Amino acid sequence: MLPALAVAAFVLSLVVQELVYPSLSWNRDEPVYLWHMEVLRAGQLAVPDGGHPDLLLPWLSAARDGEIFSQYSLGWPLVLVLGSLLGWSALGVAAGTALAVAGTWVLVEELTADRRVASLAGLLMLASPIIAVQGGVYLNYLFTLGLGLLFIVCLRRGVRKGSIWRLVAAGGLLGWIFFTRPFDAAVWGLLGAVPVVLHERHRLRALVRPAAWCAVGLLPLVAVALLVNLRLTGSPTEFPITVADPLDRYGFGMRRLMPKFDDFEYGPRLAAISTGRNAFWLPFFLIGAHLGIVLAMVGAWQRRREASVQLLVALGAAFPIAYFMFFGTNISSLTARLSGPIYYVPAYAALCGLIAIALTGIGRRRPGAAAILAVLLVLVSVPIAGNRLLVNRRLSEANEPWATSTEALDEPALVVTPPDGYLLFVNPFGHNGADLEGDVLFAMDNGPDVLTLVEEHPDREAYLQRADRPVVDLLPSEHPQTPEVELTPMVLLGGDLRVSGTVEPIPGADTTAWWLMVDDEARRAPIEVDEPLALEIAMRDLDLEDGLHTVDVLVGRGGNVDEAATHPALRRRFYVRAGDDDVVGLAPGTAARFLRPPGASDPEWLEALTLEHLRVDLVGTPVR
């Protein structure tokens, strides 16, 4: 049964990748792992920052000493590299999915010594929606689960049988977990070691030799991971994730994913809310949903005094407890309804084992009742799984325009993506591989340094990549919006450079006013707009100091001019460089509206393709 389960999980993963995730998933960790894979395939740990780390930094990555590198450890990207060397990186994902299902079978067989229970547990795991939903994405949760389950089995059997190879394998498996998800290695280590120590507590000296053999497998991988840290961060004990953002760490306090995002206080109250939200969605991704939870509780209660069942219960509770103090629990809980509670994936193996114990126990006494329960488990899960897969399919389709928008480019190009802070955060296909020499160089719209980047690449045609919806509308949701993505040629302008166009009163506003700012300082005082007004603003009249500048034309609304000046509504932004008695600007510039996003407490600038009441452009003589 074990080979059949592994093969079925492997095939399921490949099918789901093709049918549900044709254009990746909503989770932007995926493109980071794929970019990391490309870097490793090139024989590198990092890539050059091109002198513009603020423009070229991908999501969940760090910049240091002229280099850019992923915040993640190498364990999972190396698996993807192996798959790509075999011809298809998806093979690594499929192998991780198979490992999780096979690991469930192996652990339950080890704990119950009953292959029927193990086979049923493996089937239940395979049929749980979490396998289909997570088995098609380039994320490491199922892979790490498989490693952890096999680690426990190898450790237990190695100690029991005095098997050196099993003990070394146990250490190697735990080492690869450390190489993949360092924090998880500590949790899995405790789950494996504590039951063994308790069982052998009357002869602890006998565990010294097994521990030494485990160390033989563990320590080399730990050493490699620490050497990678030393190479990238300058310290063996500092991981790339804290270089990416020092506030991305375990424990309560001020926390943040990346420096350009808002920080927030993560404390016990928010941790409890987040854990509760994850716990609420957990059953929906388990075979039988809440019926499955009830049966798992029955199985745990019926054999509650058995150490094997106690270990399954501990496995089910360990990760929710361990991740309680990690702020990622809050962030992941916001999308748990879409893809499951990702940090709690190990709990599904434990729950399936307990359900299998309950069903086989019922089957011995009342076979008919057990059969009915098994059918009900499937009937409950089918509509839930179908619904979740359909939502994820739509979320994947919403990514597609980002890829297709650049397919027609037949010459070296520089594509400036939406101003969301980091490459890959909105456009999952916008990475630069292992160097900056690809046909398309992607850069973020993170300030006037974009103009310098365009000047430095005269061999590339520059384009502005924009969607017809603001970034906030493209975040993952139950009802994803598929954007239309446009590429607009960018051009450097000089000569008699000026902002030219018209501004109109905003309908419904008591007073509309416009003003101009340079680098967030007012250069033109607010002027009332009571009818369509022509604007002609020469850059040479702004007394710009030599260097790069951001020029904003703003329109506000209010009861009078002064009030309108404190309530901006529309903005056109341009980047210029002053020097040598001339000014060079980058057209066409960007547009934005000052709105309050859904669920937000404060308004913010949201990107727009056009502004009906502020139609101004940068006008001048092309300089290239």
Predicted regions and their residues:
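Short helix- or helix-capping micro-motifs
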Residues: 121-126, 153, 174-178, 192
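Hydrophobic, aromatic-rich transmembrane alpha-helices
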Residues: 99-101, 193-205, 275-320, 355
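Membrane-interface transmembrane helices that cradle and orient dolichyl/undecaprenyl
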Residues: 79, 109-115, 151-167, 177, ...
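Catalytic lumenal/periplasmic loop and adjoining terminal transmembrane helix
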Residues: 230, 361-480
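Transmembrane-helix motifs of polytopic, lipid-linked glycan transferases
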Residues: 90-112, 149-154, 295-298
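Membrane-lumen/periplasm interface segments of multi-pass, membrane-embedded glycan/lipid transferases
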Residues: 54-60, 208, 230, 235-303, ...
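Short acidic/glycine- and proline-prone juxtamembrane loop motifs at membrane-interface regions
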Residues: 133-143, 183
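Signature aromatic-anchored transmembrane alpha helix within multi-pass, membrane-resident enzymes
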Residues: 2, 172, 189, 193, ...
